[in-house]
Amino acid sequence: MVAASLSPRALYEEVAELLRQRIFSRELEPGSWIDELKLAEQYGISRTPLREALKVLAAEGLVTMKVRRGAYVTEVSERDLTDVYHLLGLLEADAAGVVATEATDAQLRELQALHQELEAAAVPGSEDRVRFFAINERFHMQLLAVANNRWRDQMVADLRKVMKLNRHNSLLKSGRIEESLREHRAIMAALVARDSAAAMQRMHEHFKNGLEAAA
């Protein structure tokens, strides 16, 4: 890839996104050293925008900068996971409570449509784990959008980036797809019933169980 092929937005932002996807796909594995010279050559750029991109990823928690050693893909510890899931549970439970009382009927129908896609991706015998988790994230992002708090949205977006570093573990746990789907059904039922307290509780339980699957 050469620099000329990158989009018009700031070069370092484009490079950050390319690296972000390589980290999420585990092409760049947790704990691995990031070879700046090799990457700069691959992308046909100087090391300056690459270093700016690494600073962005470091701010997101995806990359760890070590003095005189360079940049490494962050390894997520058990404590990191506990902290991230705890905060996500608080933030998204609060959002679910807001949605239960303030969402329009049309907005709830949109969430129900996403939930049906989730059901379709989890049909026994033909379940698609990658698609399931992609739709799952869309559902959560849509719920946050309905709750309409940009500061919460930004915090959740950053936390979810760190969560993705460990997603492969939860994907591999036997039965997690079915468990997650049951939890989503309970969340959706509480939202449709306009039961704020139940929606908050079901969402909190969802993240508690998600942590157990990811650990």
Can you say where each PLM-predicted feature lies in the sequence?
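Conserved amphipathic alpha-helical segments that form helical-bundle/coiled-coil interaction surfaces
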Residues: 101, 105-169, 181-190, 198-209
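Short linear motifs at protein or domain termini
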Residues: 1-101, 106, 200, 211, ...
